[in-house]
Amino acid sequence: TNTGRGGTINLKDDCYGKFGKFIATSLKGIEEHDGIHFNYISPINEPDGHWNWTGPKQEGTPATNREFAKVAKEVSKALVKNKLNTEILINESSDYRCMLGTHMADWQRGYEINSFFTKDSTQTYLGKTKQLLPLIGAHSYWTNTPIPYMREIRMKIREACKQKNIKFWQTELCIMGNDEEIGGGTPYDFSMKTALYVARVIHHDLVYANAES
């Protein structure tokens, strides 16, 4: 972020409603003009990322759980007002560890499953938000080695989601530079070694985390 508030959302306090209205207006305009209907909208990407937010190289935005919840509620209001049936997907976590606890950030950007789906979390609870899917989405990075840990953390996600009666979607995966087992993510590698590595990650997400997407 270039706001001088590292780790927080790049929105002014009085702009949450405007942001929700912008998303709804854009979705409605695209549908009316181009005939394209969006089944789902994810308003923020990787809010818990632990990278350097001062530059333009990351397609996400930092946000605390409270900020994310506020955005989701405003988007919900705008969708309802515009009579759109698009559903909201949260929260595109960059790291499975942030869903269960904290990782390279404080409590404000961690414990996401509990934060968004525990009724006692009065400032972040989203379980009753209109048109918000009863599930949580995340990206399958940084937790793929060693293999026993790969399975362990996904089993924990499965159990945590089961306790909150929500589903889990794995919504993004690619070969990152830290995947030393296959030599990193560049340049392009179309070998069977990489294919089997990716298949193993997907297998673990489906079987052990019970990912439905």
Where are these regions (language model features)?
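Substrate-binding cleft and catalytic face of glycoside hydrolase catalytic domains
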Residues: T1-Q131
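Receiver (REC) domain switch/active-site residues of two-component response regulators
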Residues: N39, P134, E212
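Generic secretory/membrane-interface signal
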Residues: K130-L133, I166
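Catalytic-core region of carbohydrate-active enzymes that cleave or remodel glycosidic bonds
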Residues: G137-S213
